[in-house]
Amino acid sequence: MPGEGPSETENGGTADPLQHAAIAGPLASGTTPSLTLARSVVCEPDAIMIMPPFDLFVAQLSSDSTEARVDAMKKLAIVGEAMGLEGTLSKLIPFLTENITNNDKDDDDDEILLNLAGQLAVMVPGLVPGRAALPLLPILERLCSIEETVVRDKAVETMNKIVPLLFPWGNSDDGAPFGTLLATAKRLAGTDWFTAKVSAAGILPAIYAFWYAHATKGESDNESRRELRILFKDLSEDDTPMVRRSAAKHLGRFVEAVAGLTDSAEALVRGGKPQPVIADEDKRLVTYELVPIFQALSSDEQDSVRLLAVCCAGSVGCGLAREPSVTAEVVLPVVRGGCADLSW
């Protein structure tokens, strides 16, 4: 008999019984199993149709076929939605942690890891809101250390999306996120391998901005922010050019975070917005801690580092409250030097 809708299939003939069959149970939402899924899971077709979402995900991810594993990872957020928040936190995330975070070998296909990093961003904040997303950070930390650049970049991008959402209502009644974020930054910045350090420079601005927005400004919080600034300074002085290049690339955002700017320098200048009032202490930190980093990176021996540092001039100027005299003294010499640089 012909099916009455796209979720049913013909039982006779030689047609693939899975090609148009909808998954029953928690995934019965019109989603049809792909041929990749049908060929990758070794079990009877009827068993696939009633298999719980998590078991189906694990089975496909355990396939010998790279195509099947990539296909499974692309559906991670869908699996999470089918499992719900409780199932995601109790089963799905621990499974990913065990297989990704605790895996010391980079033997997973880069495309699988790239899709994992992207799917984690999709899961927040809809499925895993606020501090419930904290268990995702160790997974992303591991991905931030992967050798493949596109995987690291996607992990940093996802981390930067998740960090501001850890307190969606500005509620900071416990210190768990602060301790976790600081420890994550320290581990990435303190490793011997440059890949993690490159990622550390990319997430420090978001972590500092989170601290600035939600911490109590007490003595311990001031010390933690000082540690974050020291981490960034150390990265800017690293022996490896790739690390210094990453520090130069993200210096502008770090300056904006330290100055407490809620808008980027580009948004302020191009949007014609008035300069926000910057607290004297924040301006002092920019002047005496970050301006020297800006000046050092803009005169780095590597031309790629110098170029990225000069591009941060607008952020530095906004971090100094766009005061004409300070801009003329601090920012313009760097811009003039960049204009006269013979490397470009």
Feature annotation, model-predicted:
Residues 1-344:
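Extended, low-complexity, acidic/polar intrinsically disordered regions
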